[in-house]
Amino acid sequence: MLETGQTAPDFTLPRDGGGDVTLSAQRPKAVVLYFYPKDDTPGCTKEAIGFTEHLDAFTAANAVVIGLSKDTVAKHDKFRAKYDLGVILASDAEGDVCERYDTWV
């Protein structure tokens, strides 16, 4: 488990829309990294829409929002398009990053 002040483990994962997202490449921005179980489920949809609705405030605070689940990039692309999401959606299909962050989604 990560402790307060501990550096978050770096990762590179495929993301919605193609390409990859690397945590360390986001510097010097702050990163809001949220883990969620599954695309297009009621709670996860509400969460992603909420982050998208507040994206301007995160951007103004020099922060980037990354949602991470075990869904495939293809599922992320459908989820993003269906709800016009503005956050980055990273695919941890093997669960390696979830394991390093000691979270189960």
Residue ranges and their predicted role:
Residues 1-105:
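Chalcogenol-based redox active-site neighborhoods
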